[in-house]
A protein has these predicted regions:
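Oxidoreductase and adenylate-handling cofactor-binding alpha/beta cores
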Residues: 107-113, 152-169, 208, 220-233
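Stable alpha-helical elements in mature extracytoplasmic
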Residues: 18, 22, 76, 103, ...
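Extracellular ligand-binding/catalytic regions of CAZymes and related secreted enzymes
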Residues: 28, 179-189, 196-237
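Helical hinge/lid and interdomain linker segments adjacent to catalytic or ligand-binding clefts
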Residues: 2-5, 15-92, 96-99
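A glycine-rich, often tryptophan-bearing local segment used as a flexible ligand/cofactor-contacting loop or short
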Residues: 61-148
Length: 237
């Protein structure tokens, strides 16, 4: 199987460190992996038609942030939509996929959600050290092959508050305490989900601010299974 990683955006999320780890994970599972530090190849989807999987590792790319973060053009978005619609899989995590390309609403329709906050921090919080909380991740479909055998777990990281598509197939959730924003107490937000985009399969997990988050065994296994599942969409069609 062939995968392409598109790596860039905010360096605070250390995109290349994540790309190196993820590339090794995919290669250990039989993938041939190409890494691009530009989105320009998406403008020529016909050249990428043999891909089985795309993963964006490109966070905080929007016009309100610095120009060097990069952004996605309409032509690049159209190319991505065409590739996924034709059966290529899409898989990713955290802000690298869920807080990217905010100027492209159809991109967020594609992935099924959008990051909006991580209480007590906000998207523009100037004290990021205040953003970490201990929170539970609850596996809500224990018989689903993507999470079978993975137990619910606790993690200390950014707890992503997401706006999500109700058509998502939710595999794991988290519940907000209200300790920092009282009015969201008890709110259940998806953490991991799958969805379809025409012939393509989409997988997302909101965990992953630090690379060590993805190295947690439960998270590594969800990412591994999710990527393989997404990449097999063409074969299942």
């Amino acid at each position: 199987m062939k995968a392409a990683l598109f790596v860039g955006g905010w360096q605070g999320h250390a995109p290349m460190d994540f790309a190196d780890w993820y590339k090794a994970l995919l290669e250990a599972n039989g993938f041939q992996v190409d890494v691009y530090e530009t989105l320009e190849p998406l403008e020529r989807p016909e050249d990428l038609a043999d891909l089985d999987l795309i993963t964006p590792i490109w966070s905080s790319a929007r016009s309100g942030h610095r120009e060097e973060f990069g952004n996605m053009t309409k032509a690049q978005e159209d190319g991505l939509l065409k590739l996924i619609g034709n059966g290529c899989g899409l898989a990713g995590w955290h802000g690298h996929m869920g807080d990217a390309f905010r100027d492209r609403p159809t991109y967020h329709f594609l992935i099924g959600g959008q990051f909006v906050a991580h209480p007590p921090g906000w998207p523009d919080n100037l004290q990021p050290d205040d953003d970490y909380v201990d929170y539970d991740v609850t596996i809500c479909q224990p018989d689903n092959p993507l999470v079978r055998g993975i137990r619910s777990f606790r993690i200390r990281s950014e707890q992503y508050y997401m706006l999500t598509d109700p058509s998502n197939n939710v595999l794991a959730t988290t519940t907000f305490s209200g300790d920092h924003l009282w009015w969201i107490e008890g709110t259940v937000i998806p953490v991991t989900w799958t969805r379809r985009w025409d012939k393509g399969r989409v997988f997302y997990c909101s965990i992953g601010h630090e690379l060590d988050d993805l190295k947690l065994p439960q998270v590594t296994e969800m990412i591994r299974r999710g990527a393989i599942w997404a990449a097999n969409g063409k074969r299942a069609a």
